[in-house]
Design a protein with these regions (language model features):
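Local cysteine-cluster metal-coordination motifs and their immediate loop/turn environment
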Residues: 108-110, 139-152, 195-216, 248-263
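Iron-sulfur-associated redox domains of electron-transfer enzymes in respiratory
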Residues: 1-190, 194, 208
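Ferredoxin-type iron-sulfur electron-transfer modules in oxidoreductases and energy-metabolism complexes
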Residues: 171-195, 212-320
Length: 320
């Protein structure tokens, strides 16, 4: 499979259809695989790998790459306009056209599609190829609770079926175990987990749903960027707020838990939100297609039993 991917990437580069390739690169050890950008056939032959250790979801890297592509286009257009103002006969500089090739496993394509829906990635700047997951070695958190092996929003598929057999997912089983606990038991569980947090921000930085250019947790004026938490409340604050911020947009890719150096099961927080959203608003899988409206960004006056709740509660506060 690795040879097929390299051959296809080299072919697209040679044809000029893509100018960059986002894939995986081997490090010092066989299991030390990291995302990488390739720009030539020689680089692909030397460093590109695809095996069971290629765990990283590559979709988020497209946010920064396509942003730079669009900035280059906008800068050229602006320069052309300014040149015309100085000299009406000035010739326009050609608008740079750059396309990046990315290899996405079925699970990763959901993150890619969700980013497209949120306009965080420009579709014309990306050529997406769906590749098989090969039951990636990830410690079990992702592949053992796979939600679907069907790739979405890809331009091409290599070694993966467009309509694979449905997956019998058991990913909500752990959430149900937490729900069966008493409030005190859940409180003790999460306090124990969050007490190990280093605030390294790895979960935020890897999360495809966390794409804000300026994060609230990097604000020194609000004292939200500190690394040391004085109380258990502060330890939980970061993770709970982040879970709220990605609610309805999290595709359950599992990257947050995969990169956590303390092995905190952060995916359980996100799955609890997903489970509640499905029960309250109906089945919804973020990133499953481009058409379905996000559950948390949709308002239906006919189906909302409390359409006047804001007005009524504001009146209650005024009366107090």
């Amino acid at each position: 499979m690795q040879d097929k991917l390299i051959a296809r990437a080299k072919e697209l580069l040679a044809e000029g259809k893509v100018q960059k390739v986002v894939g995986w690169k081997k490090g010092l050890f066989d299991d030390d695989i990291t995302p990488a950008v390739f720009t030539s056939a020689a680089e692909l032959d030397k460093d590109f790998v695809f095996n069971k250790f290629c765990k990283a979801n590559l979709s988020k890297y497209l946010v920064g790459i396509t942003r730079q592509i669009e900035i280059a286009k906008s800068t050229t257009r602006m320069n052309n306009t300014m040149a015309k103002q100085r000299d009406p006969n000035a010739k326009d500089a050609p608008i740079p056209q750059e396309v990046v090739l990315v290899f996405l496993k079925p699970n990763d394509t959901y993150s890619f599609t969700q980013l497209l829906k949120e306009n965080r990635i420009t579709r014309g700047d990306v050529y997406a190829i769906g590749v098989p997951c090969q039951d990636t070695l990830d410690g079990g958190e992702v592949c053992e609770t796979c939600k679907n092996k069907k790739p979405v929003s890809c331009d091409e598929l290599i070694g993966v079926e467009a309509e694979p057999a449905p997956v019998q997912s058991t990913r909500m089983a752990e959430v149900e175990k937490l729900e069966a606990m008493t409030a005190d038991e859940r409180d003790a569980f999460w306090k124990n987990e969050f007490s190990r947090c280093l605030r390294c921000n790895a979960c935020r930085d890897i999360c495809p749903a966390c794409t804000c250019e300026r994060c609230v947790f990097d604000n020194n004026k609000l004292y939200t960027s500190q690394k040391v938490a004085e109380t258990s409340f502060e330890e939980s604050l970061f993770h709970i707020i982040r879970a709220w911020h990605v609610a309805g947009r999290c595709t359950d890719c599992g990257e947050c838990s995969r990169v956590c150096p303390q092995h905190i099961p952060l995916y359980l927080l996100n799955r609890k939100f997903i489970k509640d959203i499905n029960e309250i608003y109906g089945d919804y899988q973020a990133g499953s297609d481009m058409e379905t409206k996000p559950a948390m960004l949709t308002f239906n006056a006919e189906g909302d039993p409390e359409t006047t709740i804001v007005w009524e509660r504001s009146k209650e506060r005024e009366a107090e």
